[in-house]
């Protein structure tokens, strides 16, 4: 496995959406992901309200989608999850993700709704140090 890459770029309010494409290029997105597979966009909703330092912002989401599409990633889906501190529907609405996803035809799925996806049991093939002791089933 290749080492992780971190890309940092100076931006401005006028260029921030476009700058995401350059960030994705610098980080090696095209080499790390397979255009023939469905690409899951996992937004971060730490709280229902907009907290730019804690949540995905609409401009991050739009810049990422634009970059993915420009690089040939056309099978995109945004997946929301449920936590003890978030209500995904409210976070999606309050953080203004819906208009961005609709603009680019990216469907929303919820990993806790049976109609959206099912969970498959994963059995690690390697010996685990402690994970199997913490999560026994």
Predicted segments, located by residue:
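N-terminal and secondary-structure boundary signal
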Residues: 1-137
């Amino acid at each position: 496995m290749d080492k992780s890459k971190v890309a940092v770029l100076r931006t401005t309010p006028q260029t921030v959406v476009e700058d995401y494409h350059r960030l994705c290029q610098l980080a090696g997105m095209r080499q790390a992901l397979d255009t023939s597979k469905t690409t899951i966009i996992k937004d971060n909703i730490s709280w229902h309200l907009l907290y730019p330092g804690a949540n995905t912002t609409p401009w991050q989401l739009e810049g990422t989608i634009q970059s993915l599409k420009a690089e040939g990633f056309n099978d995109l889906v945004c997946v929301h999850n449920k936590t003890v501190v978030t209500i995904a529907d409210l976070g999606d609405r309050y953080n203004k993700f819906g208009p961005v996803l609709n603009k680019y035809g990216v469907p929303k799925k919820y990993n806790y709704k049976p109609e959206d996806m099912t969970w498959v049991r994963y059995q690690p093939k390697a010996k685990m140090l402690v994970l199997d002791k913490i999560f026994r089933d």
